[in-house]
Amino acid sequence: MAAAAFVPIPTDTYKLGFIGAGKMAESIARGVVKSGVLPASRIRTAHLGSARRDAFESFGVKVLDRNDQVVEDSDVIIFSVKPQIVKEVVLQLRPLLSEKQLLVSIVAGVKLKELEDWAGHSRFIRVMPNTPAAVGEAASVMSLGATATGEDGELITKLFGAIGKIWKADEKLFDAVTGLSGSGPAYIFLAIEALADGGVAAGLPRELALGLASQTVLGAASMVARGGKHPGQLKDDVASAGGTTIAGIHELEKGGFRGTLMNAVVSATKRSQEIFKR
């Protein structure tokens, strides 16, 4: 793969294009606009369906008819299509792609090496966001391709920082990322449902129980993320001797709560490895 002269992305004027106009692309675009990282006038995508066109146009994004139009009018291009069609899509657009453009993939399970081979160059960054992107609370992880620069990484950090938090990691860790943050929201949804059911069993009205459960999880997560204390210390702080909390924790420990969560992450990681093994 021949190296091209490096051209920095013009951070003050660059245009962002989405190949694929689904819910995740919409969440990213909305977050970027809402946070002020980019004005909607510098974002574009393509779709022929009225519902998806309306969704993007409702906050000012330019919606074109064809993917090639998006590529020709963008400096940073995010591929957000389904894994089973990404190869075909990238190969179709390959004649229009150049190393003057920064390419980004949020497609699950498709490795950088494959993306680089299909695109014909390696100025690529792979990002794995998760579904809380829809409410601006994504946990995303990125890995840089062979010729993506530190400046490219900073640009993507700023973009995806608009929908939550983003970390940098080696791509070989992405199956484990899938097992933890990719599948993790479903584990937490299950935990919230179980907490609410427990509240109902203890006599609370369903609506109150669900509200208390979801807000408790949100508050506890915020204490871990922002407070600087280890979760074990936070647990100890609230579990007083002979009290209600330690009695509840005792039941969780008898049920193998920690081990079950750990096993869920490991099992999902292994399944990711099986599904996306090539």
From Swiss-Prot:
GO terms for cellular component: cytoplasm. Pathway: Amino-acid biosynthesis; L-proline biosynthesis; L-proline from L-glutamate 5-semialdehyde: step 1/1. This is Pyrroline-5-carboxylate reductase. Its main location: cytoplasm. PROSITE patterns: P5CR. Belongs to the pyrroline-5-carboxylate reductase family. Its EC number is 1.5.1.2. GO terms for molecular function: pyrroline-5-carboxylate reductase activity. It is found in: Cytoplasm. It holds the Pfam family P5CR_dimer. One of its GO terms (biological process) is L-proline biosynthetic process. HAMAP family: P5C_reductase (MF_01925). It comes from the Eukaryota. NCBIfam families: proC (TIGR00112). Keywords: Amino-acid biosynthesis, Cytoplasm, NADP, Oxidoreductase, Proline biosynthesis. It catalyses: L-proline + NADP(+) = (S)-1-pyrroline-5-carboxylate + NADPH + 2 H(+); L-proline + NAD(+) = (S)-1-pyrroline-5-carboxylate + NADH + 2 H(+).
